[in-house]
């Protein structure tokens, strides 16, 4: 599977023609903003909105490690990637991984949130996520990376014997 990292402008330009068959797109926008305008849509599409806020929001007092409750309050206040959204990304990956040849991860500038999602998937698939962190064009959001990677590890694919549809269950943490 080819994994691409793109910006809003890149995707809007790409969508002026048909996407290649077997393409999936994880499209991320800022909270409260419109989703990317697609003239043509890929075979599989997941659209999410959350802001590009990283770990530094938790470092307001030197030596203070925020509690789980404090983290949740900050995550909500700053519209960060939620655990539920991370599970949506993991489920989307599991639901499409065997039927796609290209996965595109897109955010506003194609540098932080989309890079983090791509890095988490690459790390999960082949332990090559570090290549995104090492690339000069990207600055992966560490919160997004961590949450998506955890969701990928926690999300267990289960085949429903009646419908043969892929469903996901989460392990107890």
Task: Please give the residue ranges for each predicted region.
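Catalytic cysteine-centered active loop of the rhodanese-like fold, especially the PTP/DSP P-loop
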Residues: 97-125
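Short catalytic/ligand-binding loop motif for oxyanion handling, primarily in non-cytosolic enzymes
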Residues: 34-36, 56, 111-116
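Glycine-rich, flexible N-terminal cofactor/catalytic loop recognition
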Residues: 1-54
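Conserved aromatic-histidine-acidic binding/catalytic patches
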Residues: 77, 81, 105, 109, ...
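Cysteine-dependent PTP/DSP-like catalytic domain, specifically the C-terminal lobe
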Residues: 119, 123-173
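Recognition helices and adjacent regulatory flanks at domain boundaries
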Residues: 87-97, 108-111, 133-136
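Helix-loop module immediately N-terminal to the HCX5R catalytic loop
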Residues: 46, 50-103
């Amino acid at each position: 599977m080819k994994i691409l990292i793109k910006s809003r402008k890149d995707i809007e330009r790409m969508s002026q023609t048909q996407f290649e068959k077997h393409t999936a797109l994880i499209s991320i926008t800022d909270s409260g903003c419109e989703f990317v305008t697609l003239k043509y849509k890929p075979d599989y599409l997941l659209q999410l909105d959350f802001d590009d806020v990283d770990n530094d929001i938790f470092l307001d007092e030197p030596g203070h490690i925020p509690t789980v409750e404090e983290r949740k309050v900050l995550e909500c206040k700053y519209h960060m990637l939620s655990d539920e959204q991370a599970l949506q990304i993991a489920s989307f990956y599991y639901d499409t991984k065997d039927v796609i040849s290209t996965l595109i991860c897109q955010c506003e500038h194609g540098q932080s949130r989309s890079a983090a999602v791509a890095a988490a998937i690459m790390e999960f698939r082949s332990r090559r996520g570090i290549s995104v962190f090492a690339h000069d064009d990207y600055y992966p959001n560490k919160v997004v990376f961590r949450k998506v990677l955890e969701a990928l590890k926690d999300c267990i694919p289960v085949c429903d014997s009646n419908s043969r549809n892929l469903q996901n269950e989460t392990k107890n943490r």
